[in-house]
Regions:
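Charge-dense, helix-prone N-terminal extensions
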Residues: 1-112
Length: 112
């Protein structure tokens, strides 16, 4: 995982670390780092940080139903109960109760 973070912007890494702490707090979550992203797994990978950029991180959370929010950039529906919800985090204040609810929904999806 440290290889993935190496060379990334300090601000982006700080957002990642905050998101990671919140994602790990929703339950029995395992980090699943890969070459192009860092996943969060509970059964299945239910969330991932797909990019760490200067001043933002790009994230997705998989849920049983599409998330209806202006914060969601795009939803990929892979099946009746598999919806990949993409959004960005551009400030620490955006890692809020709404994101925690989405992570909990993803966590439940992970063992579904």
């Amino acid at each position: 995982m440290e290889d993935y973070l190496e060379g990334k912007s300090p601000a982006g890494v700080a957002f990642y670390r905050e998101f990671e702490a919140v994602a790990l707090s929703v339950g029995d979550v395992v980090l699943a780092p890969a070459k192009t992203r860092i996943g969060f797994q509970h059964g299945r990978i239910f969330a991932a940080v797909n990019a760490i950029r200067q001043g933002r991180i790009d994230v997705h959370i998989v849920t049983a139903r599409p998330i209806r929010s202006r914060r969601i950039r795009r939803v990929e529906s892979l099946g009746a109960s598999d919806h990949v919800n993409h959004f960005s985090i551009e400030s620490a204040s955006q890692i809020d109760e709404q994101v925690i609810r989405w992570l909990r929904a993803g966590y439940r999806w992970g063992v579904g």
